[in-house]
Amino acid sequence: MNDLDFRVVGMTDQIECYVASKYDRLRINEYMIVEDIKQGDILCQVTETHSVNEFMESNTADSYITKEQILKLQAVGYNISEGIKYIYKLRVMDDPAFAIEAGSTVRKPKFDEIKHLFYSGTIDKSLEIGIIKNTEEIYKTCPEEYKNLLKIMDSNQKVHDQEELVYLFNYYNMIEYPHIGIFGGSGSGKSYGLRVVIEELMKKSVPTIVFDPHNQMVFKDRTLENYGIDFSDKFEVLKVGEDLGINFPDLNRYELISLIETQGELTESMKSAYEAILDKDSITQSSANAFLDYLTTISKALSDKEDDATGYYERFSQLVNVDSLQAVIRRFNRLLNTDIFLNTSQKLFEALKDGKTVIIQGTQKMLNLYASYAVNSCYRKRRRYVDAMTSEYFPIICMVFDEAHNFCGSDQISVTRRIIKEIAQEGRKYGVFLILASQRMAAIEQTTIAQLSTKFIFRISTEKDLEAIRKETDLSSEEIRRLPYLSNGDVFISQAQIGKTLFARIRLAYTT
């Protein structure tokens, strides 16, 4: 049995062809080389597999032969099992000038022939996410540096050494191809995949913020002894309200109004009232309580329609609607009651400058509130440093949002959504990158989704999300049909930096 068993059959074109063999040796997503008689070697990928028996009808769904017919065929010397042939549909990965030549032989590729398809960078500049499935034969021909990099847990929970090509994500290319989406239904391996991505960022000491609403992203307990590295000095877990908060005197008037808006949408009249007051006086109060007293005093002067020693009525009566100001005060009072101003964010900023990953935990409500400040503050700090180069140093950062639809949902009108959208569009210029994980891809704001250059697609079955995948990725119709049936941990990776979709499996995580 050799590679000459595979030949191109039937009608072909420049996009796809069919290959026939008497031996069932190919699987979905395997890579093959068509040795085109006139155009040379053409790289292809298996997208469909079919089995045909020459003794049976092949053009109807209910084709079969009876036991009696089989016995008659055997009696005259026919072997039914030898009548089976295998047909494979191949999608062309190269760009041939002409249709593939019928009758061409087909063989399996070697590593050097296919390396460009998988890898855009070196191992030291890449994240080791998992393995590229169905590449065992190619793995045998790859250099030693690509071998024994990780372990894999199969669908039966058994751990294996690496036997297929490693999937490497070149994170240095995120300047050109920014932002990552990780999507999958419940039990698909989406959260596990997110854990592995964060582990890899920690290995490379990439400063990272993780908003963790499920309080599960802790990296202390090892999966296997002597597997992976010790992350204990590479991350910190901080809780909003206990370890993290907002230092009120550090806020400018734009940051403060964004925080107030988290407690309820502000009308134009409310914004005008706030801006009129802050246009006359910047935030000079030393605390949130002092600022509340300041607003309350102005409101009382406007309600009483008379001046006192402050002169607030004369200064603001023509500029500020008292009802709008009172609405702002009610929202600010609710903000004050969250205790968000009892701590500072200094621990966050210092950890990021040290190249650490910061896991931020809390209720979804508190995470949304704190994210509206922290995400904006980190982005502005990095932007000021890049633009001015004289500002205080602030590093390149990744911002990870688990359950991202709760931070930037398409049906939300929130400060956090607005900031995330801005980073999605402008962040790459400043070295600020997003990683959004969600069970509901279709629920995320569409402009943000469109800016994700790499998408990890785990098992998904809801029609709305499948439709979003059709629109926002380059998965083929065959791959989308397979999505509801993927095993836990199997994933399609749609990656702009290599211009291809790969079928992969997430590696065994170093931690639990």
Task: Pin down the residues of each PLM region.
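Basic- and hydrophobic-enriched, low-structure N-terminal and domain-boundary segments
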Residues: 1-183, 193, 197, 393
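Conserved nucleotide-binding/hydrolysis micro-motifs of P-loop NTPases
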Residues: 51, 94-96, 214-218, 243-244, ...
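Glycine-rich phosphate-binding loop of nucleotide-binding enzymes
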Residues: 139-239, 446, 480, 493
